[in-house]
Amino acid sequence: MKQLLLLGAVLFITSCGDEPVPKPKAYLRLDYPTPDYNRSTEQLPFSFDMNSISQIEEEVKYNAEDGSIGVNIDYPKLKGTVYLTYKPVRDNLIDLLRDAQNLTQKHTIKADEIEGSLFENDENRVYGMFYEVGGNAASQSQFYATDSLRHFLSGSLYFYAKPNYDSIYPAAVYLKNDIKHIMESLQWKE
């Protein structure tokens, strides 16, 4: 009788369970607006097109000692910022180029890859490099641009969140395209 009760209990417990079904894959639905660009209106030695979902942080940082200017373009909805640094060229172009390239190379520790692409806009006298950094690096995109004579601008994209590449990838791609548009629309003021 005990064996019959035990057998009945085992059958009851095992027969009531649902068959395990794997959960379907879920994908984030991230809708980013189509970029709408307007010309920057800041009092800077350069101008560029800005995405309407971005804003320049209130405080533009001027350094009277070396003439450098720091401008932060904030993307609140994407939790990212593009940090721009302008420096006048004063017989120091090689140093400025080396510093910009070294900043990118500092990310090789965490980066899976760093892909650089040359940028040239003869009409506006803008020449530079755009770097796309793959992997869990702190900065996903970096660039520098110069006219080789008077102006030098560098920029880096950083997110407010821990750099988990899979999570920030869609926003990084969107902002990468914005940074490329900044480079393409960049004009030096004489």
Region spans (language model):
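Second-shell loop/turn segments in exported
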Residues: 82-90, 142-143, 165-173
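Bacterial lipoprotein signal-peptidase II cleavage site
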Residues: 17-23
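Signature of long, low-cysteine stretches enriched in small and polar/charged residues
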Residues: 98-154
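Secretory pathway targeting signatures of secreted, lumenal, and periplasmic proteins
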Residues: 44-98
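C-terminal motif of bacterial Sec signal peptides marking the signal peptidase cleavage site
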Residues: 12-15
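Post-signal peptide N-terminal segment of mature Sec-exported envelope proteins
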Residues: 24-45
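Positively charged n-region of N-terminal signal peptides that target proteins for export
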Residues: 1-4
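Surface-exposed amphipathic alpha-helical segments
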Residues: 156-190
